[in-house]
A protein has these predicted regions:
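Cleavable N-terminal export/targeting peptides
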Residues: 1-29, 229
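Short glycine/proline- and aromatic-enriched beta-strand/turn motifs that initiate or cap beta-hairpins
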Residues: 21-65, 69-70, 75-76, 220, ...
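Residues that define the transmembrane beta-barrel architecture of outer-membrane proteins
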Residues: 30-32, 42-48, 58, 99-105, ...
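Membrane-embedded beta-strand positions of outer-membrane beta-barrel proteins
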Residues: 34-38, 62-66, 107, 126-130, ...
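Extracellular loop and loop/strand-boundary signature of outer-membrane beta-barrel proteins
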Residues: 35-38, 90-98, 154-161, 206-213
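Transmembrane beta-strands of outer-membrane beta-barrel pores
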Residues: 38-42, 66-72, 111-113, 130-138, ...
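Gram-negative (and chloroplast) outer-membrane scaffold detector with strong preference
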Residues: 54-150, 166-167
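Predominantly the C-terminal beta-signal and adjacent terminal strand-loop region
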Residues: 168-229
Length: 229
């Protein structure tokens, strides 16, 4: 009988603990959140994203975001080369296309700890997001064809829909909440290959594959501002 009472008390405590933690936890008081996130990654690119998330369970949120990724520096080895096309003998990549720019959507799940610490009106916890970046499956570049004579050139757009369009990622972070506002800082790890579409662009027996190094892992740091309601 004693063992049964002990087990019953243990089960009751296990059931009540999440309820009491939820009731006293600062971060579970509001169900909806709007986020603005900025990221710098190891592919010389910045990302800007707007997202919405909803609390599904006390410490589990689901969200969806949309944004843009753009390089501020390109590390391509070549931006021109030889070609045999009509009377033209060489090609040159448009300067506007030196740096990759992509649009993306980002569905994700966020798992958070209960509130770990607070000081005055500042409340702190840890969270981790996991999801997939869904890239717009299209990329184009402008190519100018030259023959060595001034004012004799031709400009064409070449495009592809082949490339890495689904990119898994994780984002561990430290989060601080003050009333309705939140601030997060953390790291991002993904399988982003930023040049995957570029390497699939071909024109007149010329492949851009050799211009870009293959890198299957990307890391970055991000800052997030949020409003909860």
């Amino acid at each position: 009988m004693t063992h049964r009472k002990t087990i019953s008390l243990f089960l009751l405590a296990a059931l009540l603990l999440p309820v009491s933690a939820t009731a006293s936890d600062f971060f579970t008081k509001r169900e909806n959140q709007i986020n603005m996130t900025g990221t710098l990654n190891s592919r010389y690119a910045w990302q800007l994203e707007l997202s919405y998330q909803h609390r599904l369970l006390p410490f589990v949120d689901v969200g969806i975001g949309a944004g843009m990724l753009k390089q501020w520096y390109d590390d391509a080895e070549v931006a021109s080369g030889d070609v045999a096309y009509k009377e033209y003998t060489s090609w040159r990549l448009s300067e506007d296309d030196y740096r990759v720019q992509k649009l993306f959507a980002r569905p994700y799940v966020q798992v958070s700890t209960p509130e770990l610490w607070h000081s005055g009106s500042c409340h702190f916890r840890l969270n981790t997001q996991a999801g997939v970046m869904l890239m717009l499956p299209y990329e184009s570049v402008g190519i100018t064809y030259l023959n060595g004579r001034p004012h004799e050139e031709e400009y064409k757009i070449h495009s592809t829909s082949k490339g890495q369009w689904a990119v898994p990622f994780v984002r561990p972070a430290v989060e601080m909440g003050i009333e309705d506002l939140g601030f997060s800082m953390g790291a991002e790890f993904s399988t982003l290959d930023i040049y995957s579409f570029r390497r699939n662009i071909r024109f007149h027996n010329v492949s851009m594959d050799g211009m870009y190094e293959k890198k299957r892992f990307t890391w970055g740091v991000f800052l997030n501002l949020s409003y909860s309601f």
